[in-house]
Amino acid sequence: MVRTQTESSTPPGIPGGSRQGPAMDGTAAEPRPGAGSLQHAQPPPQPRKKRPEDFKFGKILGEGSFSTVVLARELATSREYAIKILEKRHIIKENKVPYVTRERDVMSRLDHPFFVKLYFTFQDDEKLYFGLSYAKNGELLKYIRKIGSFDETCTRFYTAEIVSALEYLHGKGIIHRDLKPENILLNEDMYIQITDFGTAKVLSPESKQARANSFVGTAQYVSPELLTEKSACKSSDLWALGCIIYQLVAGLPPFRAGNEYLIFQKIIKLEYDFPEKFFPKARDLVEKLLVLDATKRLGCEEMEGYGPLKAHPFFESVTWENLHQQTPPKLTAYLPAMSEDDEDCYGNVSWPGWRARQVALGPPCTGLHARAPDPRVICSRKGRVSVPLRQACWWL
């Protein structure tokens, strides 16, 4: 996300800065002298505001629904940034001003090695710019698709990094609400950097608010409480963590169907299968995270927080104190990669060779009345209609 705002052209509702974040007109705002400062003390000089011409823009790193992320080199320092660029006119037209403001404000609160860092913001008459740390190795999802599934050592290491990041984030009173492999980037040294905070929620300490009441997220990782109660909590991120651990081992998320409606039905009924060769300790961890009752998930406040989660047998060999200084393991495939032709646009695929264990708990869905699309018509990522999909045999 990016924001910009000039004195002459400022989109309504986009502040120039905030107390907790960098001002939109350049680097972080300088603190004002306090009441006890000398009468004639001069404020420190403000750094020159950054402008687009200060950078050489290169390849496109990613494109969202209303933003583009471009690799840029600062001419004065030769330092590389991922600069998120967004047109003011578009965000106003699409009512995305709160999204942009939220991302800026949340990222300005974070100072942790496992999160993308916001270095500066600036703007011109037409565009907003966020200067972000450059995660050179791209999305975690890319490696899941390339490798197929991670071996136990890799699964443990990257799961531990995500747990460490969530512990920090939740300690700040922030819910991510859209945690998924696409939003977990890998930097040059192969450490994770979590990104995309446009749908994040900062909980209010005054009201002791523990939930965020709006429907956001991605179908395969949405928690059941968001579907039944229309609200998310810190424990909703732990549900997403369980889905990600499953995907690291199996290569696909646990809840898959021909369309979002059917995916939601499976989530609410807790219907998913474990492959026969799923690591036993990882399986136990996933089962303790994919729990319908948000207050019973391992790691949530009602279950004594992150201590019991980090003490789970799956993490027995993990040294938590210096994860960001440990050498990441070489990515090693547990099972071969799946062809894109085997997966539809919802991650749905037929897996022969499974000894399916169906987990079916909870009442049927009562809160969703939308008519489901015809499940026989499934669009693949390459735009074809496939009925049925070609079966994948990579788990045999």
UniProtKB/Swiss-Prot annotation:
Q: Which InterPro entries match?
A: Kinase-like_dom_sf, PDPK1, Prot_kinase_dom, Protein_kinase_ATP_BS, Ser/Thr_kinase_AS, Ser_Thr_kinase_AGC
Q: Which reaction does it catalyse?
A: L-seryl-[protein] + ATP = O-phospho-L-seryl-[protein] + ADP + H(+); L-threonyl-[protein] + ATP = O-phospho-L-threonyl-[protein] + ADP + H(+)
| Residue ranges, annotated region (Disordered) | 1-53
Recite the UniProt keywords alphabetically: ATP-binding, Cytoplasm, Kinase, Membrane, Nucleotide-binding, Phosphoprotein, Serine/threonine-protein kinase, Transferase
Enzyme Commission number(s) of this protein: 2.7.11.1
Q: Where is this region: PIF-pocket?
A: 86-130
**What's the superkingdom here?**
Eukaryota
- The EC category is transferase
Binding-site residues, ATP? S65, F66, S67, K84, S133, Y134, A135, E139, E182, D196
Coiled-coil ranges (or none):
none
Task: Identify the PROSITE patterns for this entry.
Answer: PROTEIN_KINASE_ATP (PS00107), PROTEIN_KINASE_DOM (PS50011), PROTEIN_KINASE_ST (PS00108)
The known PTMs are summarized as: Phosphorylated on tyrosine and serine/threonine.
SUPFAM superfamilies listed in its UniProt record: Protein kinase-like (PK-like)
Active site, per annotation: D178 (proton acceptor)
Example GO CC term: the record gives:
cytoplasm
GO biological process assignments: intracellular signal transduction
Bias-annotated ranges (Polar residues):
1-11
Q: Which residues form the Protein kinase domain?
A: 55-315
Pfam families, sorted:
Pkinase
Single GO term (MF): protein serine/threonine kinase activity
Function per UniProt: Phosphorylates and activates not only PKB/AKT, but also PKA, PKC-zeta, RPS6KA1 and RPS6KB1. May play a general role in signaling processes and in development.
Q: Know anything about its domains from the record? A: The PIF-pocket is a small lobe in the catalytic domain required by the enzyme for the binding to the hydrophobic motif of its substrates. It is an allosteric regulatory site that can accommodate small compounds acting as allosteric inhibitors.
Q: Which family does it belong to?
A: Belongs to the protein kinase superfamily. AGC Ser/Thr protein kinase family. PDPK1 subfamily.
Q: What is this protein called?
A: Putative 3-phosphoinositide-dependent protein kinase 2
* Protein species of origin: Homo sapiens
